[in-house]
C-alpha cells in the first residue's frame, strides 16, 4: 500500500496488463496519431455563422450608428496618425448626444449624483441642503443605502412615486406609481412593451404602425421580434404633420397581410422635429379607440419645444380630457428619458414608462419580463429622479438650476432657427421649421448623375451624398434612407447640439459642399 501511494504521488503508476489493459505510452501514441489524422476545423465548421445565426438579428439595421459612423471612426484614427485631410476634425452631428457636443451638465443633477455615489460627501458643506435631501431619500430607498445594490425590477419605489407626482403636476391628472416602470433609457421600455405585444404568424403576425420618417429603434425592434412594419407617412409639405386619413390608408392596406395592433407616435418628432397639436392628438386617440390599437407615445423630447406657436401635450393628458369612454378603454404606454430635454444625460441610461389600462394579468407578465434583466441601472434611476424632481421655488438651488435650464433651452431655440434659416438659403435644400426635438431633417436635391454614381457604388443616393460630405468636410450626418422617406426624395438628419460657433461652421461647410456637389453632378 505504501509503495502504491508513493507511485501515485510520484505520478508513475504500474503498467496495466491483461486483456483490458495497455501501457500509458501506447495509449498516448495512439491518441497522438488520431489527432494528427483528424482534420483541422475551418471557419465554415463554426457553429455560429451568418447562415446559422438568428435571421431576425441579421435583419436589424440601425442607421444612427451605421456605415457613415464607422467611416467617421476610421477617419478620426487616420487624423490621429497624421494623415492629411481637407479638415482637422470629425464633427459627429449624427446623434443627439448633448454632452459629447459640449453642453455642460446641470449642476444640481451632478451634485445629487455625486452625493449618491459617494455618501461621505453628505457631510461636506460644499453641497446645498436640497441636493443632500434628495440624495438621502434616494439612498434610504436603496438596499444597504447604496446605489450599488439591486433595486426592485420595476425600479426604486420612491423614484416611481416621484415620477407619478411629476406626471400629475404636468397633466393635472392623477398618476399611479403602480403604473410606473423605470427603464434603461426609453429604448428599453419601448422594446419591452413591443415584446409583450408581438405574436402570431403568417397573416396573423402583429403589425406595428410607425411614422415615416421614424427613429430607427422602431424598425430595428420590429425586425428583431419578427413583427410586421406598417408605415404611415408624415406630411412633409405640411411641416411633417400627422394625417389620420394616412393612418387609415396604412391600416387598411396592412390588414391584407398582418394583424395591426400597435400605433407608435413620436412627439416631438425624431428626426422631423414637429410638435403635434392637441387636435391632432385627439384625432389619433379617437382612431386608436375606434380601431382597437395599442398606443405607444414616445415623448422623450417633451421639454424641447422651441416654436412660440407650439406647446407639448402629453397623450395621457389628452386621453383623460376626452372623457371616460376613452380614458378607461384606450391602452397607452408613454415614455420619457434622462437623455434629452435640457439635462442631456445620455450615459446614465435613465428612463421610465407609464402604462394605462393594462390588464392586471398582463402587468404581471410585464414584471416577469422586467425581472429577467433584474433591474435598470440604479444610478440611471437616480438621474431620472432629478429630471422629474428638480429644485422648486424657495429651495437653495432653484435660482441656479433655472438659469442653467433656460440657458440650454434658449440656446437650442436659437440654434433651431439658425439652422432652418441657413439651410433654406441654399439652392437645392429645403428645411421645415424645427418646432422641437434637436435635429434638422432637410430635403436635398440629388441630381440624376449623382444617383447613377451612387448606384454604381451600390449605395443609396443619400448615403452616397453623406459619405462624400464626411470625406470632404469631416461632418458626420445620417442619410434619410436610414429613417425612411417617400420614394424619390432624399434627406439627412443633423443634430443642432454643437455650440453656436461650431454649428455655424457646420452649416456653412454643408452649404459649400452642397453647391459643389450640384455643380459636379449637374
From Swiss-Prot:
Q: Which cofactor does it need?
A: pyridoxal 5'-phosphate
Gene Ontology biological-process annotations: 2-oxoglutarate metabolic process; biosynthetic process; L-alanine catabolic process; L-alanine metabolic process
N6-(pyridoxal phosphate)lysine PTM positions: 340
SUPFAM superfamilies from the UniProt entry: PLP-dependent transferases (SSF53383)
Its recorded reaction(s) are: L-alanine + 2-oxoglutarate = pyruvate + L-glutamate
Q: Which residues carry this modification: N6-acetyllysine?
A: 414, 504, 511
Enzyme Commission numbers on file: 2.6.1.2
By its UniProt entry, which InterPro entries does this protein fall under? Answer: ALAT1/2-like (IPR045088), Aminotransferase_I/II_large (IPR004839), PyrdxlP-dep_Trfase (IPR015424), PyrdxlP-dep_Trfase_major (IPR015421), PyrdxlP-dep_Trfase_small (IPR015422)
Top-level EC class as recorded in UniProt: transferase
Specify whether Transferase is a keyword of the entry. Answer: yes
Q: One GO molecular-function annotation for this sequence? A: L-alanine:2-oxoglutarate aminotransferase activity
Q: Where are the transmembrane segments?
A: none
Any one GO CC term of the record: mitochondrion
Q: In which tissues is it expressed?
A: Specifically induced in fatty liver. Highly expressed in muscle, liver and white adipose tissue. Moderately expressed in brain and kidney and expressed at low levels in the heart.
Q: Which family does it belong to?
A: Belongs to the class-I pyridoxal-phosphate-dependent aminotransferase family. Alanine aminotransferase subfamily.
Q: What else is known?
A: May be responsible for increased ALT activity in hepatic steatosis.
Function, please?
Catalyzes the reversible transamination between alanine and 2-oxoglutarate to form pyruvate and glutamate.
Protein name in UniProt: Alanine aminotransferase 2
Q: Which organism is it from?
A: Mus musculus (Mouse)
The taxonomy runs: Eukaryota, Metazoa, Chordata, Craniata, Vertebrata
Per the record, the gene is Gpt2
